[in-house]
């Protein structure tokens, strides 16, 4: 049976049926619709004002690759400028290949690129070193806890280094639905309440962050990358298989099989969630060490680094953080090297 005609241009043969709407589109019309929807998300949400210098968190994976490509297409209409910021977590045999993909993208799209490294920012600590430090104590799960906090801080530092006014990340609807499930299963009411919306306004001196792909499903992100023939890195992190997020992802797939709208339902439910006044966490203050937003004396990044430098990495996770205040000062970390912008190589 021949493929139906594209429901948009009525000329080309349809190449796909959109998972959300069931509309049959050719590849070109699908990509145009995808870009128009991202544009609407940005404009309607007032996420990136004209004149914004936008740091794009670039990992080399499909989501950040699609985000960078779409924003590059939309930049003239939005009146924004882009700067790719990549984070080198120090994961041997994995991150080097991903960074190579980012460098190819930067060269092909003529976008400036800056790479910041954990080792430079965090006293010599890399994720491989963190993994060795947490070996034998739920290593993979602990690694993801450390990496999520440190990567967020590294991206913020990289964005400041390049003079960015806003930070964007490639989180899609599936990512956000998984996060909602994780916070619900952990009983983390505070994070559930903070998880709604398309980003954060930049409280306490932090740069405003947003997620322009938050309403786009993972399937459509993959389809866009396919039809635009984008070059991206697709291997999973070596520390990811045992992470709690994987269990939330499996649960989400089962929910989606029974209810196709489950992903966006979860995303929108987080936006509508409101906590009772007695359940709301206190307003964040400033970290006593680095000045970043913090709900306690130390922010998450400083608390995790304290645990590592004391040789007790698990102490800084969850309720164990309270114990850090009762101990003496940590060992002095190794001196950090200054951050530098990395020129884009010629390819």
Curated annotation (Swiss-Prot):
GO molecular function: nucleotidyltransferase activity; tRNA binding
Stated role: Plays a central role in 2-thiolation of mcm(5)S(2)U at tRNA wobble positions of tRNA(Lys), tRNA(Glu) and tRNA(Gln). Directly binds tRNAs and probably acts by catalyzing adenylation of tRNAs, an intermediate required for 2-thiolation. It is unclear whether it acts as a sulfurtransferase that transfers sulfur from thiocarboxylated URM1 onto the uridine of tRNAs at wobble position.
Protein name: Cytoplasmic tRNA 2-thiolation protein 1
PANTHER family: ATPASES OF THE PP SUPERFAMILY-RELATED, CYTOPLASMIC TRNA 2-THIOLATION PROTEIN 1
Gene Ontology cellular-component terms listed: cytosol; cytosolic tRNA wobble base thiouridylase complex
Gene3D superfamilies attached to this UniProt entry: HUPs
Region (Disordered): 315-347
Compartment annotation: Cytoplasm
InterPro entries for this protein: CTU1-like_ATP-bd (IPR056369), CTU1_C (IPR032442), Ncs6/Tuc1/Ctu1 (IPR000541), Rossmann-like_a/b/a_fold (IPR014729), TilS/TtcA_N (IPR011063), tRNA_thiolation_TtcA_Ctu1 (IPR035107)
Protein origin, superkingdom: Eukaryota
Organism in which the protein naturally occurs: Bos taurus
GO biological process, one term: tRNA thio-modification
Keywords: Cytoplasm, Phosphoprotein, RNA-binding, Transferase, tRNA processing, tRNA-binding
Keyword tRNA processing: yes
